[in-house]
Amino acid sequence: MSDNHTLHIEEILDLLPHRYPFLLVDRVLDFEEGKFLRAVKNVSFNEPFFQGHFPGKPIFPGVLILEAMAQATGILAFRSVGKLEPNELYYFAAIDGARFKRPVVPGDQMILEVEFIKERRGVARCRGVAKVDGEIACEAEMMCARRREV
């Protein structure tokens, strides 16, 4: 881990099982274990889903904004709750109160902010927000569950 509470892509790849095209966290800008995490997703026109969402009016799919926030939640959980066993993962378990406030388009830099609320019996609850240029694009509460791989 970097000394200044950032995580580069190599460190993110060590924590998350996701790979292209579903790795949606490019870098962790700051975090404090058990408290919060701030990450970035650079939105490129080269993302494969922009071909169909929507032709002539590309918009980052809302469900993928939530997935990016969930991945940030997973990273925070990995860093906060302790080392997982080799056959364990954090699974996206629930989402509550999701709200979309503005579209995210190619060229945007999406800042993902997640705040740890609590952990009980292997289930972590976090509050998340995705922002572009300081404006909220999406907000939700998410849970991820620590489970053995199936």
From Swiss-Prot:
SUPFAM superfamilies: Thioesterase/thiol ester dehydrase-isomerase. The keyword Lyase applies. Its main location: cytoplasm. The keyword Protein biosynthesis does not apply. GO terms for molecular function: (3R)-hydroxyacyl-[acyl-carrier-protein] dehydratase activity. Keywords: Cytoplasm, Lipid A biosynthesis, Lipid biosynthesis, Lipid metabolism, Lyase. It is an enzyme of class 4 (lyase). GO terms for biological process: fatty acid biosynthetic process; lipid A biosynthetic process. Its EC number is 4.2.1.59. The gene is fabZ. The active site is at residue 53. It catalyses: a (3R)-hydroxyacyl-[ACP] = a (2E)-enoyl-[ACP] + H2O. Belongs to the thioester dehydratase family. FabZ subfamily. It comes from the Bacteria. It is found in: Cytoplasm. This is 3-hydroxyacyl-[acyl-carrier-protein] dehydratase FabZ. GO terms for cellular component: cytoplasm; membrane. Involved in unsaturated fatty acids biosynthesis. Catalyzes the dehydration of short chain beta-hydroxyacyl-ACPs and long chain saturated and unsaturated beta-hydroxyacyl-ACPs. HAMAP family: FabZ (MF_00406).
